[in-house]
A protein has these predicted regions:
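Short aromatic/hydrophobic "clamp" motif used to bind/position activated sugar donors
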Residues: 24
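Non-catalytic, C-terminal membrane-associated alpha-helical segments of glycosyltransferases
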Residues: 143-151, 162-220
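Glycine-rich, basic loop-to-helix element that forms the pyrophosphate-binding segment
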Residues: 1-19
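A short, conserved alpha-helix in the catalytic core of glycosyltransferases
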Residues: 76, 80-92, 97-127
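Conserved donor NDP-sugar-binding/catalytic core segment of glycosyltransferases
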Residues: 31-66
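Active-site donor/metal-binding and catalytic loop motifs
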Residues: 116-140, 152
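Hydrophobic/aromatic residue at the end of a short beta strand that borders the catalytic acidic motif
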Residues: 8, 27, 32-37, 83, ...
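Acidic donor-diphosphate engagement hotspot in glycosyltransferases and nucleotidyltransferases
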Residues: 11-12, 36-38, 103
Length: 220
């Protein structure tokens, strides 16, 4: 659909716009579907009728504590989601200002503010390999560190009191700077770079700059 690396949110929005079905199944490349996962998700979609997102469960959380096979929740993880196209369009889809991280958290927040319903189906299961959908090593680590902090600041500014957010992240900037100095004294190049990327992502987001950083890798 695109030769350009659009980012998670913008790429999904493009697919949602082009889709001709009432539901769209968003799935990350590092996810393995368990038996009957799609079937169980579609069954719950037909049963519920009124939903914005239904998510399968992954291996990382103890969902056996859930009393019902289908339970309402505040938010889900974005690596596997069956979405209602109509509901997602109503709240403006994914925020394309976010390139990586917190996209689904932001979407779920807007859906809940619009009184939409989000569910998990513990009979629909996946295995999430976590960050193995890319194989670019240290470049991805740099990108991950930069965008993790950029997105955390952006999300906080979007939904919280700005004075508190700026105070909190200015303190964090100072801590990050101290860590950079610390790793310089240890000649630890990897940690110097990682902490510098976090510092840069935090600072750029605080200053209102876009999520511009991209790894030096050809995704085409």
């Amino acid at each position: 659909l695109s030769k350009k690396n659009l980012g998670y949110g913008a790429a999904n929005n493009k697919i949602i716009r082009k889709s001709k079905t009432p539901y769209v199944f968003i799935l990350s490349p590092d996810v393995i579907l368990k038996k009957n996962c799609e079937k169980n998700l579609l069954k719950s979609a037909d049963k519920l009728n009124d939903f914005s997102i239904i998510s399968p469960i992954s291996q990382y959380k103890d969902y056996d504590l859930l009393k019902s096979s289908i339970s309402e929740t505040e938010e889900v993880q974005g690596f596997a989601m069956l979405i209602s196209k109509k509901k997602i369009l109503r709240v403006g889809m994914f925020d394309e200002k976010i390139f990586l991280y917190a996209e689904e958290t932001d979407l779920c927040r807007r859906l809940k503010l619009a009184n939409e319903k989000i569910y998990i189906n513990k009979n629909a299961k996946v295995t999430h390999l976590a960050a193995k959908s890319t194989n670019i090593g240290f470049e991805f680590d740099k990108c991950r560190n930069w965008h993790w902090m950029w997105s955390q600041v952006y999300f906080s500014k979007k939904y919280s009191n700005n004075f508190y957010v700026y105070f909190k992240f200015i303190i964090l900037l100072l801590i990050q700077f101290i860590k950079i100095i610390f790793y310089i004294t240890l000649f630890n190049k990897k940690e110097i770079i990682n902490k510098t990327m976090r510092f840069s992502g935090t600072l750029n987001s605080l200053l209102g700059r876009s999520s511009w950083y991209r790894p030096k890798h050809n995704f085409d």
